[in-house]
Amino acid sequence: MKILYSLRRFYHVETLFNGTLALAGRDQETTGFAWWAGNARLINLSGKLLGAHVAHAGLIVFWAGGMNLFEVAHFVPEKPMYEQGLILLPHLATLGWGVGPGGEVIDTFPYFVSGVLHLISSAVLGFGGIYHALLGPETLEESFPFFGYVWKDRNKMTTILGIHLILLGLGAFLLVFKALYFGGVYDTWAPGGGDVRKITNLTLNPSVIFGYLLKSPFGGEGWIVSVDDLEDIIGGHVWLGSICILGGIWHILTKPFAWARRAFVWSGEAYLSYSLAALSVFGFIACCFVWFNNTAYPSEFYGPTGPEASQAQAFTFLVRDQRLGANVGSAQGPTGLGKYLMRSPTGEIIFGGETMRFWDLRAPWLEPLRGPNGLDLSRLKKDIQPWQERRSAEYMTHAPLGSLNSVGGVATEINAVNYVSPRSWLSTSHFVLGFFFFVGHLWHAGRARAAAAGFEKGIDRDLEPVLFMTPLS
């Protein structure tokens, strides 16, 4: 047992039991980790762990490529993306690939190319994962010290952190370059109902960009979720990319300060817990972003937001009844409030009825009808365009309020289409994953802190069935 290639494979930073503990003649060294411990057996095998990560990346990219081609094969140009159960093509369309005015798909070939490129990439990653998992060195420290590491090496860990930050920064700049130089991105706010355009006037003013972080998360404010123009989004990615790259360089060139060395637990499982916490926060933010934001996630591709569908319903019936002779400026509803229009507590003119709760919605089909004090009555009477009517009628019947069995729509809308909006899927999945990752953070953080404190942790394996089975060999 003691003469294997690397003794370190049997001396883990995190162990299920302390090194001296023996139960029923079994100890950590002879039994290893339980089957349910996943990659824990690779904690100190940097080469094998690299293989696991590369193979995992290959599986992810393979799914992306395969699902991409599946969606292309099933795509029907005559129907909106959000009615077809598509979850990948809306992202490609948002980046400006294959779409024209109004979000109409004019070319599916870029989507096909994307799928094929992902499949080819997954093959490369798959071969790399198999090589490092089965054929490559178990540990990298001896053969390739630059890629090797010891979990307790604080300086090496912050160097790895720095490399990751630089890669994230470069990823942010990829979006910037696409928006500025490589065809532009889809802007739902472009005049006449949205179009692909290059971003020419970036918002780089720090008071604007960081002002979003200082806003309230509640109605009318909306924190960063309230961003509603692409100049701010792309400018924010310039700031984000720059901060990530500069922060990465900082972490590569420096060593952790004394307070950081004392404050953090420096072990593989601790890093896992930190990562899960960060991903959990990202998941919760993304959940709100997808649900409420129709600029980064255009309604032409993802379907309307909930507030947008509700406001669209009020707008559609205002248009109908106005043509039938109703005076939409003065008509009263059953509660005595305005039936079509009313004033908010701050005096702005907003839609009446149950949709009053969504008074702070901003949508490209509605904003042209606003004046300095909310909705403009004269514009509502004279300036409504056919494309606004068509879009609001479409959104009215496609609220993202469906259950998973597709029974959905605004509760008061009898014409609602039974479908599951990709906005619902994206938002719900990110909330659920964000929650699971938070629980994972608590679990692994607790184990890592227990290991650092030197007391017992893990699930008792004394009665684990596999320990009573005949050895396979």
Swiss-Prot record:
Q: Which residues get modified to N-acetylthreonine?
A: 15
Which Gene3D superfamilies does the annotation name?
Answer: photosystem ii from thermosynechococcus elongatus (1.10.10.670)
Instruction: Give its localization.
Output: Plastid, Chloroplast thylakoid membrane
- Asked if the keyword Manganese belongs to this entry, the reply reads yes
- Which residues of this UniProt protein bind [CaMn4O5] cluster? 367
Q: Which InterPro entries match?
A: PS_antenna-like, PS_II_antenna-like_sf, PSII_PsbC, PSII_PsbC_sf
Q: Which family does it belong to?
A: Belongs to the PsbB/PsbC family. PsbC subfamily.
Q: Which NCBIfam families match?
A: psbC
What is this protein's record name?
Photosystem II CP43 reaction center protein
| Organism from which the protein derives | Lemna minor (Common duckweed)
